[in-house]
């Protein structure tokens, strides 16, 4: 008999009841988490653990970044979507470079950028929920787009 653990059930409930903005925040947090785990892999002395930890977790972060890219709505804010697409493509290339060469710097760079994006998204989500809106507006999205154009 299958009995899901309570934490898994809680997580599933959180995903199913989350707003679109909260789901995006969860994706950012997941990407940050997997990149942090991949960076821990650089501390492994065993070559197999070193390579597996980095590779598997970088690939998970890349999959999340591709999902973030798929969530963009070009019809609502084409300029923002183009900027974010370019940024996510850059993140994907840098993660791939760090994974292939097994170097920390490109992975750490993506992590720094994801922290900024996640924190900005979290702030916008909080402001929107305080204002009583259930989703972010294109104007809010443009604020992130303006940041991405300067980085």
Language-model region placement:
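Preference for long, well-ordered alpha-helical segments
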Residues: 104-151
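Short helix-adjacent coil turns
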Residues: 45-49, 98-105
